[in-house]
Amino acid sequence: MTNVLFIKANGLPAERSVSVALYEIFLTEYKKSHPDDNVTELDLFEADLPYYDVTMMSGLHKEAAGETLSPEEKRLADIANSYLDQFLAADKIVMAFPLWNFSIPAQFLTYLFYLNQAGKTFKYTANGPVGLVADKKIALLNARGGIYSDGPMQSFEMSLSYVKNVLAHFGISEPEMVIVEGHNAKPDQAKDIISAGAKEAVELAKIF
């Protein structure tokens, strides 16, 4: 049985968020097209995601070195590792997220920090870091109200580009993508822009 992890990184309802609308459309079609797969949903705005602070970092580093952790270090390291274990157990992962203030929501950033662990998602070598989870199949559903694919705002796009770089660090270099952009910048075209993205999400879900 294929294990599929759906990650939603936006706390707004679908009627107010294009990335959440894409998530729900993709999820519905995926379940319809792959009825035998085991689907798990992770809502990062509802999840327990303690800030990636010095105590958590210390705990994870001590754990990797085989050292003794304090009770609080162990508690926080266990939380981070629980999300990492869930990620590692998935054969396919779908990530839906917006561009907010040129980047990603803080909850999503924290989650990705949890995943970024040497010896688990990547390893250090004499020739630099090498990803360890290249076998994962990933779909990215990204929405941004402005135009960032080209033009004067292109260099400000640090949402999709950041996530792609993190995944590349893990060895996942060619994720599937559905990108919806410009619906706020071009309100007269918003309906058509969003509709086109929704259709693209449906078609990808069928074959993902």
From Swiss-Prot:
NAD among keywords: yes
One Pfam family, short name: Flavodoxin_2
Alphabetical list of HAMAP family matching this protein: Azoreductase_type1
PANTHER family assigned to the protein according to its UniProt record, in alphabetical order: FMN-DEPENDENT NADH-AZOREDUCTASE 1, FMN-DEPENDENT NADH:QUINONE OXIDOREDUCTASE
Subunit record text: Homodimer.
Function: Quinone reductase that provides resistance to thiol-specific stress caused by electrophilic quinones.
An example Gene Ontology molecular-function term: FMN binding
Record has Cytoplasm as a keyword: no
Enzyme Commission designation: 1.6.5.-, 1.7.1.17
Cofactor(s) listed: FMN
Catalysed conversion reaction: 2 a quinone + NADH + H(+) = 2 a 1,4-benzosemiquinone + NAD(+); N,N-dimethyl-1,4-phenylenediamine + anthranilate + 2 NAD(+) = 2-(4-dimethylaminophenyl)diazenylbenzoate + 2 NADH + 2 H(+)
Top-level taxon: Bacteria
Classification of source organism: Bacteria, Bacillati, Bacillota, Bacilli, Bacillales
Name of the featured protein: FMN-dependent NADH:quinone oxidoreductase 1
Binding-site residues, FMN: 17-19
Similarity comment: Belongs to the azoreductase type 1 family.
Keywords: Flavoprotein, FMN, NAD, Oxidoreductase
Cofactor note: Binds 1 FMN per subunit.
